[in-house]
């Protein structure tokens, strides 16, 4: 059920001398009344891939709409962030044999981010980011080991923001960032599978929130989606997962319950506040159902450990559905 915001009035709709309402009719914060929190996350993605010889060209477009609330003494305000990203990538296979594969990639993406409080715009910026990466996979102790080393640089192109006259504590558009991702997949039995993923991010610049490494919630450390996440210019995130395939049918699909534990830690540059650093850990108990054109994922999330300034709920439920098309 979505929180009721029908009582809110835009400034231009108020009569001369009229005060904007702080809540619905009958709302009294002095009696302990609390207005509902609003949290919405909508993701839209499109990706097209074209392969020719040892090259792969990928075009991508995505849109993220994230709404959350924050409280003042007697009312609640809603904040919305909208991000539109267009990307192009070209990958070249350098080495491929029966056991290993090595790929070099270059890419360019343009990000347009806008933030609002109610209907008032807070920020409107464009970042253009170039990146290069080296990606490899190989067999290792009966499993498959993968690693990716990447470098990103903010560029003065396509209408991007520039850093001229910015202070040392101001977020940088012309930043440098390094990333390292590793993953390991190993079947322990015919049905039992172990997965391990780790991500490291390092930058000496103060990054915008869209470029910081974010940890917590869906697709990350479980149990922290509704209470915000932690972000950092430097970060490490680790995930361990065990899954058991109870159904493996070409006709009916694949069904796998799973259990995972994740940990994340961040640090921010030029920041002396309580949010300078943070950590969290959480567990997921879930069920995946994969078919030819549809993937479903339902999970129970439980926060375990955290920094003191984080106030997670006791539990959360996640659900996702993905439609797949090939043409």
Model-derived regions, located:
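Repeated loop/turn-to-beta-strand initiation elements of outer-membrane beta-barrel proteins
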Residues: 52-59, 66-67, 96-102, 140-145, ...
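Transmembrane beta-barrel wall of Gram-negative outer-membrane proteins
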Residues: 9-135
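Sequence/structural signature of outer-membrane beta-barrel proteins
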Residues: 2-7, 36-37, 64-73, 97, ...
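Transmembrane beta-barrel strands of outer-membrane/channel proteins
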Residues: 1-5, 9, 30-33, 59-63, ...
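Outer-membrane beta-barrel "beta-signal"
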Residues: 287-294, 313-327
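Residue-level signature of outer-membrane beta-barrel architecture
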Residues: 50-52, 92-94, 136-138, 184-186, ...
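C-terminal outer-membrane beta-barrel translocator/porin domains of Gram-negative envelope proteins
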Residues: 116-254, 263, 267-269, 309-311, ...
């Amino acid at each position: 059920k979505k929180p009721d915001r029908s009582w809110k009035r835009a400034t231009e709709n108020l009569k001369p001398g009229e005060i904007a309402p702080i809540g619905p009719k009958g709302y009294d914060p002095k009696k302990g009344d609390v207005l509902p929190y609003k949290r919405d996350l909508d993701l839209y993605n499109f990706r097209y891939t074209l392969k020719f010889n040892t090259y792969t060209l990928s075009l991508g477009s995505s849109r993220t709409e994230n709404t959350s609330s924050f409280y003042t003494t007697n009312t609640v305000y809603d904040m919305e962030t909208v991000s539109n990203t267009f990307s192009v990538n070209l990958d070249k296979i350098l080495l491929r044999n029966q056991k290993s594969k090595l790929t070099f990639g270059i890419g360019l993406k343009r990000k347009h981010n806008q933030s609002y409080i109610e209907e008032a715009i807070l920020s409107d910026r464009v970042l253009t980011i170039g990146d290069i990466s080296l990606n490899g996979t190989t067999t290792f102790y009966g499993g498959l080991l993968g690693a990716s080393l990447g470098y990103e640089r903010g560029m003065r192109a396509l209408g991007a923001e520039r850093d001229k006259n910015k202070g040392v504590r101001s977020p940088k558009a012309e930043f440098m960032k390094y990333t390292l991702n590793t993953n390991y997949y190993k079947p322990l039995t015919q049905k039992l599978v172990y997965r391990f993923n780790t991500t490291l991010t390092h930058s000496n610049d103060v990054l915008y929130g869209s470029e910081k490494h974010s940890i917590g919630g869906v697709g990350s450390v479980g149990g922290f989606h509704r209470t915000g996440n932690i972000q950092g210019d430097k970060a490490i995130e680790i995930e361990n997962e065990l899954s058991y395939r109870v159904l493996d049918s070409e006709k009916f699909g694949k069904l796998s319950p799973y259990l995972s534990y994740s940990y994340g830690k961040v640090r921010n540059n030029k920041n002396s506040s309580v949010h300078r650093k943070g950590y969290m850990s959480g567990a997921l108990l879930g069920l995946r159902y994969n078919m030819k054109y549809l993937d479903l994922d339902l999970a129970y999330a439980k926060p375990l450990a955290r920094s003191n300034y984080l106030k997670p709920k006791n539990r959360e439920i996640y659900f996702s559905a993905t439609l797949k098309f090939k043409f």
